[in-house]
Amino acid sequence: LLSNEMTCGALLMLDMNDFKEINDNYGHAIGDKIITKTAKRLKEMFRNDDILCRLGGDEFMILCRNIDEISIRMKLEDVTRQMKIPYLIEEYQIMAPLSIGFVMIPLYGTTFNNLYKKADIALYKAKQDGLASYRMYHDDMNKKAL
C-alpha cells in the first residue's frame, strides 16, 4: 500500500454496533438510511485523500494516508464522539455507534491482506471492549487470536 505519495498511514475497519437490532426494530428501509447517513457522516469527518469504502452490511474500511499514530487516535476520538450522536430518521432517534479497529502502516505491514487481517483482529478487540470504542493492532493481539 505504500507509494511515493504515501509513506505511512493507517487502515481502519469499522463496524456498527447492534445494526441487526436496528433492522429488526425499525425495518430494513430505516437500516438502509442509517447506512447511507453513516457513510456521509464518515466522509465528512475524514480528509479528501482518505479512501472510504463500504465492505458490505454494516462494515466500512478507511485507508488514511500519511497520518501518524497520535493524529489517527485524535481523529478516532472525534469519530467515536460524533457517531454517538443519534440519527433523526422519520420520527425516530436512532443511535448507531461504531467499533473501530486499526493498524498502522508500515509498522505492522505494507500488503493489503496482511493489514486487513490485523485491522480485523483489532476490530474484534474493540467490539469486546463495548460500544463506540477503538483499538490499535499490536502483535500481542495476534498471539491471543490464534
Where are these regions (language model features)?
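Core hydrophobic beta-sheet residues of small sensory/regulatory alpha/beta domains
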Residues: 11-13, 136
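Cyclic nucleotide signaling catalytic output domains
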Residues: 52, 78, 82, 88, ...
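A general marker of short, structured functional hotspots
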Residues: 15, 22, 42, 83, ...
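Flexible interhelical turns and helix-capping residues at alpha-helix boundaries
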Residues: 2-5, 68, 87, 91, ...
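Hydrophobic beta-strand core residues of beta-sandwich domains
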Residues: 29, 46, 87-88, 96
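Conserved long alpha-helical elements within nucleotide-processing catalytic cores of c-di-GMP signaling
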Residues: 2-10, 17-47, 53-57, 61-65, ...
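A structural signal for short, well-ordered beta-strand segments
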Residues: 11, 60, 98-102
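Generic alpha-helical segment signature
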Residues: 72, 93-94
